[in-house]
Each structure stands twice: as structure tokens, then as C-alpha cells.
């Protein structure tokens, strides 16, 4: 997606430790016009698939999910909540998956209320970044617990130098990334 590459080149910044920051348009301040283009692109890539719901994870994924849903006949958007500890009295009410965050070096629970994903539903997962796929696997686990089906995973920015895609494809999961970064080196972003 050339628009996304241009946004990254113009508005993205690379920190001293080679981390790409896209907070000016994606994951802090959200560029709604750009998000609409993302939604259209995901629709184009999954146009031949039945999508009953979009599943994402808080917080950046919520905006992406809502706008993307408009291009899939306004299907509902469900988001996994990140919590440190699952209260005992909630365990029977939710689907829960433990996820390791490489960014924060901690384990958290992704929870979705059982009433929001039903057996047999066709689910499209969307998220802002794909690195090691830990968050995506947490969402896939939630979908499986519900007896639903993952149609595919839509990713805005894939870190192609990390193993997320390979892990997902090894499990037969379709991955559609709008842009793939080959490497980040000396403050520069290189695309595949």
C-alpha cells in the first residue's frame, strides 16, 4: 500500500534503538482519512470471504476495527480487553488467553465476553502491527474457544524481520499485511 509507505516515510520516526513510531497517524493520534483507506484495502483483500465479525485488541485496534467494519456491511466489532489478572468470578463468563508482550516484557490476559463470539461465526482479526504474533495468537485462541472460525488476519504494518507471519502461516492462518518492513537500520525504514 503506497499510501502507507508514504505516511511512514513522511510522518513516522525511528527512535535511537530502531523502533518505528507511527503515533502521529496510527496508534496515538488516528488519521481518520487514512484509516478509511486501510478499511477499503482490507475489504479489497477479503472481498470474497464471508465476515460476520471483526475481532481486534485494545486500544489501537478499536479504531481500525470500527472503520474497517463499515466496508464489511457494518458487521460488529469485538475487541479483546487486556487485563493483568482475571478475577475468579469472571472466568465462566469470558474467553481468556494469556499473551506475552515483548514490548512491555509482561504477560497479560486477553478477554472477550462469551456472548460476543458465537460458534460458527466467521471472524476477521485486524491489528496495527505484526511482530512475533503473540497478540494475534491470543485472539485466535479466543476464536477457537468460541467455536468460531478465523477467516484471516489483516495487519497494517508487518515487521518482516520478525517471525510472526511464519508462525501464523505454519498454522494455516491467512495473513494480509498492508506493508511489510524488511529492516530498520540507522534510523531508516526499508520495505519489502
From Swiss-Prot:
The keyword Cell membrane does not apply. GO terms for cellular component: cytoplasm. GO terms for biological process: purine ribonucleoside salvage; xanthine metabolic process; XMP salvage. Pathway: Purine metabolism; XMP biosynthesis via salvage pathway; XMP from xanthine: step 1/1. Xanthine binds at residues 20, 27, 159. It catalyses: XMP + diphosphate = xanthine + 5-phospho-alpha-D-ribose 1-diphosphate. Keywords: Cytoplasm, Glycosyltransferase, Purine salvage, Transferase. The keyword Glycosyltransferase applies. CDD domains: PRTases_typeI. InterPro entries: PRibTrfase_dom (IPR000836), PRTase-like (IPR029057), Pur/Pyrimidine_PRTase (IPR050118), Xanthine_PRibTrfase (IPR010079). GO terms for molecular function: xanthine phosphoribosyltransferase activity. 5-phospho-alpha-D-ribose 1-diphosphate binds at residues 131-135. It is found in: Cytoplasm. It comes from the Bacteria. Its EC number is 2.4.2.22. Converts the preformed base xanthine, a product of nucleic acid breakdown, to xanthosine 5'-monophosphate (XMP), so it can be reused for RNA or DNA synthesis. Belongs to the purine/pyrimidine phosphoribosyltransferase family. Xpt subfamily. Homodimer. HAMAP family: XPRTase. NCBIfam families: PRK09219.1 (NF006671), XPRTase (TIGR01744). This is Xanthine phosphoribosyltransferase 2. It comes from Clostridium perfringens (strain 13 / Type A). The gene is xpt2.
